Amino acid sequence: MLRVRCLRGGSRGAEAVHYIGSRLGGSLTGWVQRTFQSTQAATASSRNSCAAEDKATHPLPKDCPVSSYNEWDPLEEVIVGRAENACVPPFTVEVKANTYEKYWPFYQKNGGLYFPKDHLKKAVAEVEEMCNILSMEGVTVRRPDPIDWSLKYKTPDFESTGLYSAMPRDILMVVGNEIIEAPMAWRSRFFEYRAYRSIIKDYFHRGAKWTTAPKPTMADELYDQNYPIHSVEDRHKLAAQGKFVTTEFEPCFDAADFIRAGRDIFAQRSQVTNYLGIEWMRRHLAPDYRVHIISFKDPNPMHIDATFNIIGPGLVLSNPDRPCHQIDLFKKAGWTIVTPPTPVIPDDHPLWMSSKWLSMNVLMLDEKRVMVDANEVPIQKMFEKLGISTIKVNIRNANSLGGGFHCWTCDVRRRGTLQSYFD
């Protein structure tokens, strides 16, 4: 089984157990060791009649609006984000650790202000066209409520302005008939959930499960205030050592650091997702789902779907610039690993929150249809060779806000059932 191999991957697995345990302390060492062991106990517990009630494996309520188990079943309903009123986040330590140095002056100058008006206008138009095309493809589209993100707020621990509701993938995760609100890790995203509450309440009234992960205080202790990030080399060394700007003070995670493949969900420790956050998700979803920690050669890990994007049963896009340390284990499990071509986005195009690899941040409408950027001809040809039809949409200006098609959406309902692809 892949779980055994993936989470006991030779010396890397042993090193991870030792490192995570030492970082989190003795009280949490046990769960780390259990995570890196066989799933025999989990399999046995899943047969226990005590777990029979209220599990995701049970039939969904009739006409439940929420039902999605993976990234590729036929898409029926989706939430698409908004660029309206998007604000540049204040230049705090967690923002600095997640952005490229060439953009730091932009944040220092514009933190708390709206993103450039003309750019936002173009992004809004692109996303509207994306919504229209999704509707024409037979997909129901929902949108978050418009909010003025420039409003300053204060908690007992910090004060900030907001960011946006552009990326529902970052804050919402659908697992079966349950929609989970992530706690987030940026202070500018503390109240981002408010834009989605009217949609989620509607789903809840119609039979969906609704879970809100523990909200972090986002006190100073959650962040390494002296995190050294003067060069890419520094970031590589720190990431290799398992050191990130977020500490283990309290659970935090962005939903976009998890990617689903039926019963198996893969997560990465990143600048915004800590081990406590992953452990919260693991316990919450057990025993029906198995959460695996995987890692990459990535100097700035934040969100998994422009690094490792599962696009079909046994089919994954793996970023050649950020190779997965456990990739051989997927190969041994019989999966096909596809290396996407180099993106063609121009060097002078602003990418304030991301890299050019948003080209692989695609949205699958089903196993044979993919929404891809109209400018990215090389990856279009790659999909065509795989027998996947491309639906071409231009979201180049929307990319500047930090996401591609996968980031800009949260698939709420896909027509399919819960299956295991690794047993």
Curated annotation (Swiss-Prot):
Cystines in this chain: none
Presence of keyword Cell membrane: no
Domain of life, per lineage: Eukaryota
Family named by the database record: Belongs to the amidinotransferase family.
Name listed for the protein in its UniProt record: Glycine amidinotransferase, mitochondrial
GO cellular component, one term: mitochondrial intermembrane space
InterPro entries for the chain: AmidinoTrfase
Name of the gene this protein is made from: Gatm
Described function: Transamidinase that catalyzes the transfer of the amidino group of L-arginine onto the amino moiety of acceptor metabolites such as glycine, beta-alanine, gamma-aminobutyric acid (GABA) and taurine yielding the corresponding guanidine derivatives. Catalyzes the rate-limiting step of creatine biosynthesis, namely the transfer of the amidino group from L-arginine to glycine to generate guanidinoacetate, which is then methylated by GAMT to form creatine. Provides creatine as a source for ATP generation in tissues with high energy demands, in particular skeletal muscle, heart and brain.
Main location: mitochondrion
Consequences of knocking out this gene: Knockout mice do not manifest aminoaciduria or glucosuria.
Keywords assigned: Acetylation, Membrane, Mitochondrion, Mitochondrion inner membrane, Phosphoprotein, Transferase, Transit peptide
The UniProt record lists the keyword Acetylation: yes
CDD domains: amidinotransferase_AGAT-like (cd21136)
Subunit structure: Homodimer.
UniProt GO BP: creatine biosynthetic process; learning or memory; muscle atrophy; positive regulation of cold-induced thermogenesis
Compartments, record wording: Mitochondrion inner membrane
Functional pathway: Amine and polyamine biosynthesis; creatine biosynthesis; creatine from L-arginine and glycine: step 1/2
Organism of provenance: Mus musculus (Mouse)
GO molecular function: amidinotransferase activity; glycine amidinotransferase activity
EC number(s) given by UniProt: 2.1.4.1
Gene3D superfamilies linked: L-arginine/glycine Amidinotransferase, Chain A
